[in-house]
Amino acid sequence: MTHSKRWLEEHAKDPYVKRAKKEGYPSRAAYKLLEIHQKYKLFKPSMNVIDLGAAPGGWSQVAKDLVGPKGVVIAIDLLPMQSMLDVIFIQGDFNEPEIFNQLEAIVAKKTLTGQVDLVISDMAPNISGIKNVDQSRSLHLVELAWDCAQKLLARGGTFLVKVFQGPGVDRFLINLRPYFNQVKFLKPSASRSRSSEIYILAGEFLGYNQRV
């Protein structure tokens, strides 16, 4: 069985896919974030959040539901995303200066401090089926997400990012730890068991220029 056929069969039988359709989420990924929030209380009312690689919008929808009407959710992705009530969407590459400047300007306009409380990323590379290639590309996306987060995250804030397990992840964690009081790996039950994806949860940001 090819990788594509196996994925399609699993997708059709996946209880989280069925649940997402029933409950109105654009993807099963919403349940990963909900599970993490239930355990670690990521979101609070009135929080300001950036969702990197947001399409199709499952995480943005969860975030907006949890931060409420006074909270701000800014979603960004290369791909288009269906419009969501009270979610600000930017289509583009946040690594490009023009797009990042647009993101920074929105954060400055919508927040009192020009910073956000939470940066989340469920980004994954286009899957080639070659494990080492996919893992390396995933780690690169994580590094880009962190580069963005460190510029816009408020002190005391939280960074949540997906990565595929493999070479370089432990080194990234070592480099990340000095900037946060808490850093841990997570594997939500909504993640497929055979998937190498894990999440890095880094809490209580010390500030990019204030690391210990």
Swiss-Prot record:
Function: Specifically methylates the uridine in position 2552 of 23S rRNA at the 2'-O position of the ribose in the fully assembled 50S ribosomal subunit.
Source species: Coxiella burnetii (strain RSA 331 / Henzerling II)
Similarity annotation: Belongs to the class I-like SAM-binding methyltransferase superfamily. RNA methyltransferase RlmE family.
Disulfide bond entries: none
InterPro entries: RNA_methyltr_RlmE, RNA_MeTrfase_FtsJ_dom, rRNA-MeTfrase_E, SAM-dependent_MTases_sf
Membrane as UniProt keyword: no
Annotated compartments: Cytoplasm
Entry annotation: catalytic residues: K162
Protein's gene: rlmE
A GO molecular-function annotation: rRNA (uridine-2'-O-)-methyltransferase activity
Primary localisation category: cytoplasm
Annotated binding of S-adenosyl-L-methionine, by residue: G57, W59, D77, D93, D122
Reaction catalyzed: uridine(2552) in 23S rRNA + S-adenosyl-L-methionine = 2'-O-methyluridine(2552) in 23S rRNA + S-adenosyl-L-homocysteine + H(+)
UniProt name for this protein: Ribosomal RNA large subunit methyltransferase E
